[in-house]
Design a protein with these regions (language model features):
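Acidic/histidine-rich catalytic neighborhood of metal-dependent amide-processing enzymes
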Residues: 1-59, 65, 89-92
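Solvent-exposed, polar/charged alpha-helical surfaces in well-ordered, non-transmembrane soluble domains
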Residues: 5, 9, 65, 69, ...
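Sec-exported extracytoplasmic/periplasmic mature domains
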Residues: 9-16, 68-76, 101-105, 144-149
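Structural recognition of the beta-strand scaffold that forms the well-ordered cores
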Residues: 19-25, 101, 106-111
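Flexible glycine/proline-enriched surface loops and loop-helix/loop-strand junctions
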Residues: 46-54, 82-85, 123-128
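Short catalytic/ligand-gating loop segments at beta-alpha or beta-beta junctions
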Residues: 74-93
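An extended, acidic, His-containing surface patch that forms the Zn2+-binding/catalytic region
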Residues: 91, 98-100
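His/Asp/Glu-rich mid-to-C-terminal helical/loop segments that flank catalytic regions of hydrolases
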Residues: 116-150
Length: 150
């Protein structure tokens, strides 16, 4: 995350405005099971790992309903708005969006939940044949619809 941290810091120092930073973090794995950083999340979200998650800080959270609605036309979409730059749920900070949260920018992580779902994550077995390319195609179509409307 060194590059995203450097960029977010530079943008803040230059007082640059940014509508939304989007981090695409693992987008193509589905599974019959899904894990969560907190067990209570299972009651709100699905037991099956066949959805894409939109994880956003408070400012970007205002965009979540529209983004989720547009993406949801293509792929099952779940939202997770996180206050306080996600500090209460450290696992949601493990990607390039978090330095933007720290600098006060609106940022969104789009994810299939990576290691919470995919046993191949950062393993030699993480190959194209382990991915669900139909799901990935629907994610891309959903991103096109959602982000194109911003």
């Amino acid at each position: 995350m060194l590059g995203s941290e450097a960029l977010a810091t530079q943008l803040r120092a230059e007082r640059q405005q940014l509508k939304l930073m989007v981090s695409l973090e693992m987008l193509a794995y589905t599974d019959d099971e899904q894990n969560y950083p907190h067990k209570a999340m299972r009651a709100v979200y699905r037991d099956t790992g066949d959805f894409i998650a939109l994880v956003a800080n408070t400012g970007a959270g205002l965009m979540l309903p529209g983004l989720a609605q547009r993406m949801g036309r293509h792929v099952t979409t779940k939202v997770l708005p996180v206050p306080s730059a996600g500090r209460a749920i450290p696992d949601v900070r493990l990607s390039d969006h978090s330095p933007f949260w720290d600098q006060g920018y609106n940022a969104l992580m789009v994810t299939d939940t990576s290691f919470m779902r995919n046993p191949h994550y950062h393993q030699m077995s993480d190959t194209v044949d382990s991915l669900d390319l139909d799901f990935f195609s629907r994610v891309v179509d959903g991103l096109d619809a959602a982000l194109g409307a911003l």
